[in-house]
């Protein structure tokens, strides 16, 4: 009830008036049934603007720190996330992260829309970073489509560290649903999970126009903060870009570059395979 009232009566109309969001591809969201909405992550405000424009309720996996804040701001943030039915995502790995994904699975099993940020954290510099395989595990185990969505300009509205937002227009592009049902009997195969995740990231790169960086955003943040990076944090192998070239399934690749560069590489790989 609180979610509906805030979205339709109070917060939603005000945000639409101030930020005038433009949207493409909204019809790619199914009218009913479960699906994963996989988004790039530029700003805290992504979790506000994107559900605002989707007609159906979207339950997001949000970092657990949002639910444990202290002080007035921290408590208000925690209250907001709870009242809007968001789920805490423990990003420490292991059993804690697995439990968070189980909660996300429950949303899908009940026919809901689950929002997830494959990068696992906000981009530190507006580029698109390597996706974590949790999104693939959920999609394969639940047998649901993945709808990629590119958030545009939210990093300019509320950059990391900025308390008050800048008033400017933002946008979002919803891509066509990605169907991975052919891999459902291989849901626990790590190589398949990596391959599926890479395809999702490729679509996000294509839709957003962001430069892709083949490294985890969390690792880059640690480095920028001057903290030591554990080798295991960046050791996960990337699926081969040419592995499924004949079927058009392409990894973002093992290097960084523009979406145009990646598409050229994709075309070349497909031609070689033929």
Predicted segments with their positions:
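Secondary-structure boundary/capping positions in well-ordered alpha/beta enzyme cores
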Residues: 21, 56-57, 87, 111, ...
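Short, basic, glycine/proline-bearing loop/turn elements
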Residues: 10-12, 83-91, 118-122
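Catalytic core of membrane glycerolipid acyltransferases/transacylases, capturing the structured
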Residues: 16, 29-94
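Short gly/ser/thr-rich secondary-structure transition/capping motifs
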Residues: 16-23, 96-98, 155
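Alpha-helical membrane-targeting segments
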Residues: 1-20, 70-85, 163-169
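Non-catalytic C-terminal accessory region of glycerolipid acyltransferases
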Residues: 2, 98-274
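A generic local structural motif
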Residues: 9, 21-26, 46-47, 74, ...
